[in-house]
Amino acid sequence: MENFEVIKALFLGFVEGLTEFLPISSTGHLILFGHIIDFHSDGGRVFEVVIQLGAILAVCWLYRQKIINLIKGFFSGDVESRHFAISVLIAFFPAVIIGVLAVDFIKSVLFSPIVVAIALIVGALIIFWVESKQFEHKTDDATKITFKQALLVGLAQCVAMIPGTSRSGATIVGGMFAGLSRKAATEFSFFLAMPTMLGAATFDLIKNADVLTSDNMVNIGVGFVAAFIAALLVVKALVLFVERHTLRVFAWYRIVLGVIILIAAMFFNLSA
């Protein structure tokens, strides 16, 4: 039976890694598939945090050379590196402020399947709207983002605190609305994810460190590795995809998933 739980942890790790950076809400998928396979982890919230950490570390690994060059450039006085680093910080801070003020409300009130389903569907409609508009893409390179554009993306990320919205979806769409090309918005979303998700993961791990035991470490470790590997596969593929295609396919998928979660919540006792 314990081996079966490890397999479930492996599966959910892959689900997290595959969905974290697609604009389709990893939270919605974890709720749905966790219910379907009846996964129970003694680590609870920590399991989710650690597999999210696995996904974001995959991005750090893929962009490691850019990160190293950015750090070197920042401290050597390179104007472009400093501009981009400050842009990421500008986009990051709204989430810090809102997160600190609203974290308890979000987890106690908004974290429910119904909210997730509604957010999925509303988010899909916003994607359709943004893709239907011919916004002037003034920025094709993520490193050339302006401070104003960065702030708009940061505010969009705050909306993603509503479970089911999708952090990547909100920041990519927010970037496009602000004047970034689809590819530039996607790449900036990845860079913004690093401080955002690493910060959130660190906060949650410290807060819930007491639930980490030898009994759940295997499940957590397996989920972490699975999420890391799956995210490696997704990130590069997504950048190539958005260069050639719109986000409409993800919008349709969100609607289908939202309807499924609504039905499951109303008739099959689906819970977060």
UniProtKB/Swiss-Prot annotation:
It catalyses: di-trans,octa-cis-undecaprenyl diphosphate + H2O = di-trans,octa-cis-undecaprenyl phosphate + phosphate + H(+). It is a multi-pass membrane protein. One of its GO terms (molecular function) is undecaprenyl-diphosphatase activity. InterPro entries: UppP. It is an enzyme of class 3 (hydrolase). GO terms for biological process: cell wall organization; peptidoglycan biosynthetic process; regulation of cell shape; response to antibiotic. Keywords: Antibiotic resistance, Cell inner membrane, Cell membrane, Cell shape, Cell wall biogenesis/degradation, Hydrolase, Membrane, Peptidoglycan synthesis, Transmembrane, Transmembrane helix. The keyword Membrane applies. NCBIfam families: PRK00281.1-2 (NF001389), PRK00281.1-4 (NF001390), undec_PP_bacA (TIGR00753). Belongs to the UppP family. This is Undecaprenyl-diphosphatase. The lineage of its organism: Bacteria, Pseudomonadati, Pseudomonadota, Gammaproteobacteria, Moraxellales.
